[in-house]
């Protein structure tokens, strides 16, 4: 994989950078700027080298139309604050305003192009259409840096096709992500523990399949665990259940046994009369995992399981965690996710290499107040880190070889 140093001297050069600025917004307020901060090392390095830094990114799913609420204006403002410099936002991605703003740049300046997904060609399935569009963007720059790890699993105009038109390299964030995830999957120090949560088993099938012959231990919580409990013959009440995955999950339980992989499931769960919505009062109670009442829904792992999961994580040299253990946004159902996060922090302090897979787990550790430096690596890619852990070839990385 080519990296920044492969691009040579960048002084005075116009460098297009595909970043991942797909941040959560409340109106125009950014509620978690983790992805913006993650892009700063690459931006600062390019500025120090005297490059003209042209940033591009997407926000939300405007589906090829201009949606004012999904403008990157809040991102430009936040970037300006973090960099201590003005970051102008072009009104378009490659049109007149983008061209004019780029033409006016001095060495070390930063410009942000408007949301790439305002253009239908960005995510087009037609390769020729995407390539023609990418050429228009590429005309703005003289080199391309791919630093949006959150989109490397997609072949899209601004991260895949542009790389074919310009000298291309991975930015510091993508390089760091690939190093960290490779360290965990290629030659992990053992015991190697994988902790999986989140609502759906179907989202994690590939990861389970790929890691069943690599991990020493698979720890499972979150909504997806009820399909495992059901596969073991337990009743799960009104908990989330993917009936169509039961046979697959039974197969995983058998394979784990055959491969000598320790499969750790909760022994107790926190249940409630239903999913906590709006202002409905919650009445959580703890029940054994094999005794969930017919009218109750499991929403977190119980106290006994919290200790069990924590101890299994601490007894590891490499830990990869993807997906919360419960509905962590509701305080009554956050303890499981906290216990796992604390387990990773304690394991890291004891010398283990720990990765928090992006998406919900990354937001959870930030929202629950854990220090970012308590973990070896917090990934910025949800789907991308999952596909990397599945052992898939990622198009946005392949073009940088």
From Swiss-Prot:
Keywords in alphabetical order: ATP-binding, Cytoplasm, Glycolysis, Kinase, Nucleotide-binding, Transferase
Catalytic activity reported: (2R)-3-phosphoglycerate + ATP = (2R)-3-phospho-glyceroyl phosphate + ADP
Subcellular location per the Swiss-Prot or TrEMBL entry: Cytoplasm
Superkingdom of the source species: Bacteria
Keyword Transit peptide applies: no
Pathway the protein takes part in: Carbohydrate degradation; glycolysis; pyruvate from D-glyceraldehyde 3-phosphate: step 2/5
Enzyme type, top EC level: transferase
CDD domains linked to this entry: Phosphoglycerate_kinase (cd00318)
Pfam families: PGK
Binding site for substrate: 20-22, 35, 58-61, 117, 154
GO cellular component: cytosol
GO molecular function: ADP binding; ATP binding; phosphoglycerate kinase activity
Primary location: cytoplasm
Quaternary structure and partners: Monomer.
Family from the record: Belongs to the phosphoglycerate kinase family.
Name of protein: Phosphoglycerate kinase
Lineage: Bacteria, Bacillati, Actinomycetota, Actinomycetes, Bifidobacteriales
């Amino acid at each position: 994989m080519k990296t920044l140093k492969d691009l040579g001297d960048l002084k005075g050069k116009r460098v297009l950078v595909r970043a991942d600025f797909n941040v959560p917004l409340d109106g125009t307020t950014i509620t978690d700027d983790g992805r913006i901060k993650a892009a700063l090392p690459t931006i600062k390095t390019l500025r120090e080298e005297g490059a003209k830094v042209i940033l591009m990114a997407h926000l939300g799913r405007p589906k090829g139309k201009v949606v004012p609420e999904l403008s990157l204006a809040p991102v430009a403002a936040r970037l300006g604050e973090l960099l201590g410099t003005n970051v102008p936002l072009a009104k378009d991605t490659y049109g007149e305003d983008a061209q004019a703003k780029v033409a006016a740049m001095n060495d070390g300046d930063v410009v942000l192009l408007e949301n790439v997904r305002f253009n239908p060609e960005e995510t087009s399935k037609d390769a020729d259409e995407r390539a023609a569009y990418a050429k228009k963007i590429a005309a703005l720059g003289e080199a391309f840096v791919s630093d949006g790890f959150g989109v490397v699993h997609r072949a899209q105009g601004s991260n895949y096709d542009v790389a074919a038109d310009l000298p291309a390299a991975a930015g510091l964030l993508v390089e760091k992500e690939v190093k960290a995830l490779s360290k965990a999957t290629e030659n992990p120090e053992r015991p190697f523990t994988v902790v999986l949560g989140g609502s759906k088993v179907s989202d994690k099938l590939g990861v389970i399949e790929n890691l069943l012959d690599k991990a020493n231990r698979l720890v499972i919580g979150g909504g997806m665990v009820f399909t495992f409990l059901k596969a073991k013959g337990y009743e799960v009440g009104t908990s989330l259940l993917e009936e169509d995955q039961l046979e697959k999950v039974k197969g995983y339980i058998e394979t784990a046994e055959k491969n000598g992989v320790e499969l750790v499931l909760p022994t107790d769960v926190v249940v409630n009369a239903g999913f906590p919505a709006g202002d409905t009062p919650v009445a959580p109670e703890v029940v054994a995992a094999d005794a969930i009442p017919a009218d109750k829904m499991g929403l977190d792992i119980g106290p006994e399981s919290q200790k069990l999961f924590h101890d299994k994580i601490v007894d590891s040299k490499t830990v990869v965690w993807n997906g919360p253990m419960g509905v962590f946004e509701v305080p009554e159902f956050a303890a499981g996710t906290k216990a796992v996060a604390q387990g990773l922090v304690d394991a890291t302090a004891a010398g283990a290499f720990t990765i928090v897979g992006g998406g919900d787990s990354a937001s959870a550790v930030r929202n629950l107040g854990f220090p970012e430096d308590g973990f070896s690596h917090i990934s910025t890619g949800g789907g991308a880190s999952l596909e990397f852990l599945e052992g898939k070839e990622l198009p946005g990385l392949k073009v940088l070889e």
